[in-house]
Amino acid sequence: MNEHNIVITGFMGTGKSTVSRLVAEKLGRTLVDTDAEIEKRIGKPVARIFAEEGETYFRLVERRMCRFLAAQRGFVISTGGGMLVDDGNRDVMLASGTVVCLTADPEVLAERLRADQSDRPLMRGNWRGLLEQRRSAYESIPIQIDTSHKSPEQIADEIVALCQTASV
């Protein structure tokens, strides 16, 4: 597998998981969801890792996962929303392949997050403040796709076309 990775990131509610799955299916690549991988390796859900070990511990595990995956080739990687906020993680992933940051209008995010019943540790706080804190990190990623008024299928097709043009 000589192909570069395709890394899909963004704030919670932007569609990372759904879009990543579709991109992997369309390209016949293996999908790696970083949060799911961390859960598998640690043996507990992310929410429990946050509750029992704290965010600092989680970010350390996440950093290790980032470096491990960046050394692999040919994956579609769906990151946790905070993984590429870390400058080092972002640089490592940018060097490993094509990184796409999914965005959405705050009003659209609010609607999606209200409809999402999953247990997101950082949802318990002020998600708008968290989005604002992460904004500059997300904006530093060169490829941005606004998911506000597009279907997951449209977004996946856009990413596939982008990667085929770039020969990723």
What are the roles of these predicted feature ranges?
Residues F11:
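P-loop (Walker A) phosphate-binding loop of NTP-binding proteins
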Residues T34-M83, D87-L94, A137:
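ATP-dependent small-molecule kinase phosphotransfer cores
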